[in-house]
C-alpha cells in the first residue's frame, strides 16, 4: 500500500520527542484543511501504530472520501488513539456549498466538483459535505435517485453508524439547524453567508476560507486548550486576512 515517507519521518521524530520529554509533557493536536484531511489521515494512523495518542483532531472542509475516513480516522478512534469527542469538523452547510464557486467557472463548491468529477466514483460522498452525514441523503434503493453512487453505500453506512453512534440524524444538511447541542459541539456547520477574516474584513463563505475565519480558528484553539465555548482567549485572534 501507499507509504507516505515524509509522514513516516515526521512520526519517528515525534516519537523521539515524546521519548525524550516524556508522554505527560507532549500533546499532539492535528489540524487539516481540505486535502489536509488526507495528510492527517495517514499521519494519525502512523502515530497510533506507534502508540502515540492524539489529543485533538480538527478538520476543516475535509476533502477525503468516507472510505478513506473509515480506514483512518474511524480506525484510530475505535482503537483508542483519539477520543470521539475530540474529533472536530468544520464544514459548510449544503446551502453554502451550492452558493460557493471554483474560480468563477464551476458554480458550486470545490467539494462538489471533486465528488462529481475527480473521484473514482462519480457522486462520491466526501467527509466535508453535510449531505454525506445526513440520513435524509442515504437512501440507496434507487440508483437513479440516490444522492450518492450506489457503490458508495457501504462506506456511507459504516461511517455514519460510527460517527452518529447508530442514530443518524436527518434534515440538517441544508442549513445546519436541527442538530442537538452535543452533536453540534463536534460537527460545526457554517451557514453564515459571510466569514470574518479581521476587524474590518468579511468575505463570502467559501471552501478556502475556513482557516481565515476568526470564529473557526478561535473555536479550534479553544478545543485544543480545553476551554468552554464561551471562554475568552487571553490572546485572541485579531486579523487572519492574509
Residue ranges and their predicted role:
Residues 1-27, 46-240:
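Lipolytic serine-hydrolase domain surface
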Residues 41-45:
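Short, hydrophobic alpha-helix immediately C-terminal to the catalytic nucleophile
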Amino acid at each position: 500500500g501507499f507509504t507516505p515517507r515524509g509522514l513516516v519521518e515526521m512520526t519517528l521524530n515525534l516519537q523521539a520527542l515524546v521519548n525524550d520529554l516524556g508522554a505527560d509533557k507532549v500533546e499532539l493536536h492535528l489540524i487539516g484543511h481540505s486535502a489536509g484531511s488526507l495528510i492527517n489521515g495517514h499521519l494519525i494512523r502512523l502515530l497510533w501504530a506507534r502508540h502515540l495518542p492524539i489529543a485533538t483532531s480538527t478538520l476543516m472542509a475535509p476533502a477525503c472520501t468516507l472510505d478513506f475516513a473509515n480506514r483512518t480516522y474511524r480506525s484510530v478512534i475505535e482503537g483508542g488513539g483519539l477520543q470521539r469527542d475530540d474529533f472536530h469538523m468544520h464544514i459548510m452547510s449544503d446551502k453554502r456549498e451550492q452558493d460557493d464557486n471554483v474560480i468563477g467557472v464551476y458554480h458550486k463548491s470545490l467539494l462538489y466538483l471533486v465528488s462529481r468529477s475527480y473521484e473514482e466514483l462519480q457522486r462520491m460522498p466526501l467527509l466535508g459535505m453535510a449531505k454525506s452525514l445526513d440520513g435524509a441523503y442515504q437512501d440507496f434503493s434507487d440508483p437513479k435517485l440516490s444522492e450518492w453512487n450506489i457503490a458508495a453505500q457501504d462506506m456511507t453506512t459504516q461511517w455514519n453508524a460510527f460517527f452518529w453512534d447508530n442514530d443518524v440524524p436527518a434534515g440538517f444538511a441544508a442549513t445546519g439547524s436541527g442538530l442537538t447541542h452535543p452533536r453540534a459541539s463536534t460537527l460545526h456547520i457554517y451557514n453564515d453567508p459571510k466569514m470574518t477574516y479581521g476587524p474590518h474584513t468579511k468575505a463570502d463563505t467559501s471552501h478556502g476560507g475556513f482557516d481565515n475565519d476568526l470564529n473557526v480558528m478561535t473555536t479550534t484553539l479553544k478545543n485544543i486548550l480545553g476551554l468552554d465555548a464561551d471562554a475568552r482567549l487571553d490572546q485572541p485572534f485579531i486579523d487572519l486576512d492574509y
